[in-house]
Amino acid sequence: MNFSKTLLKNSKDGISSVIFSPSVKNELIAGCWDGSLLHYQISENPELLGKYDLSSPILSLEYTDEKTALVGNLDGTVTTLDLNTRNHEFLGNHGKGVSCISKLRLENCFISGSWDKSFRVWDVRVKQPVEGQDIGKKIFASSSRDNILVLGCSERENLVYDIRNLKLPFQRRPSSFKYMTRSVCCNQNFEGFVSSSIEGRTSVEYINPSQEAQSKNFTFKCHRQIQKDYDIVYPVNDLKFHPIHQTLATAGGDGVVAFWDIQVRKRLRVLNPSKINISSISFNVDGSMLAIATCAQEEAAGNIYVHALESNFAAPKLKS
């Protein structure tokens, strides 16, 4: 399969989040600022399987299973949406917008983070929060892998939790950035995470507090352009690791997706699918497709693209 498809073009409202199904490799959902959730099947001739209208702009999304979505909205509500029956159920709410949702290792459990300075843990079977903490800082981004949960917060701080004890973080890590964190993403190949900011930078951080591990931390510039002798800096809005090669993809306000081998600290290649702000990206389960969503202040700025990737597209370069 070799194609590049546009699923949605020139939508009047931007796309806040796009995510592939964790089990069905050719299905994805996207959340929009007009409050609609879009459900697509991807092939040579993509099909819109459903459009579901919610009452508030969608900020965050996650699949709970192959036919159910967990949705976080600008008005603070958290709901589940059955993609088959179109039924949605109210689970609970935050006091402000739900900026992020992440799946936890615990069965059927998910975490939502909010601008109201709290997180909640939801068991979708009992349809109510089973745990939550007010942390005193706005939560901008979250990511979880194995027993680790990372929250990217206001006041230039990242909080690292063990999901078996969410009462207090076991690490409070000062951000590597001067300005706001936009995204965090845990990695399976090393005990750490990456984070990005609005200042055109990405940071690689190891959780092990040993001097040897901490010496491997580094920050690099990305998503910048030189125009008439000026360095134009763009936000790095999303971070995803390729599910097979574990190389890093960064998505920026410059309309570019860049691929990086963080083990050797090198950029591998770039995709230039858009001239406007990329808000969200997602790999499908086998890494053969990449979905790219855009969102900007201009009219008709909401687009969704899907690129089919060759098996070695995101692979690290072989050492000579």
From Swiss-Prot:
Keyword flag Ribosomal protein: no
Designated gene of the protein: bub3
Name of the protein in question: Spindle assembly checkpoint protein bub3
Species annotation: Schizosaccharomyces pombe (strain 972 / ATCC 24843)
Gene3D superfamilies the record matches: YVTN repeat-like/Quinoprotein amine dehydrogenase
Single GO term (MF): ubiquitin binding
Family: Belongs to the WD repeat BUB3 family.
Any single biological process term in GO: mitotic metaphase chromosome recapture
Annotated WD repeat ranges: 10-50, 53-91, 93-132, 231-270
Record's subcellular location: Nucleus; Chromosome, Centromere, Kinetochore; Chromosome, Centromere
Function field: Involved in mitotic spindle assembly checkpoint signaling, a process that delays anaphase until chromosomes are bioriented on the spindle, and in the repair of incorrect mitotic kinetochore-spindle microtubule attachments. Localizes bub1 to kinetochores and suppresses activation of bub1 away from the kinetochore.
Keywords: Cell cycle, Cell division, Centromere, Chromosome, Kinetochore, Mitosis, Nucleus, Phosphoprotein, Repeat, WD repeat
Keyword Transmembrane helix (UniProt): no
GO cellular component: bub1-bub3 complex; kinetochore; nucleoplasm
Disruption phenotype: Sensitive to thiabendazole (TBZ).
Residue ranges crossing the lipid bilayer per the database entry: none
Subunit annotation: Part of the BUB1-BUB3 complex, composed of bub1 and bub3. interacts with mad3. Interacts with spc7 (phosphorylated on MELT motifs); to recruit the BUB1-BUB3 complex to kinetochores.
UniProt PTM: Phosphorylated by bub1.
SUPFAM superfamilies linked to this entry: WD40 repeat-like
Main location: nucleus
Disulfide bond entries: none
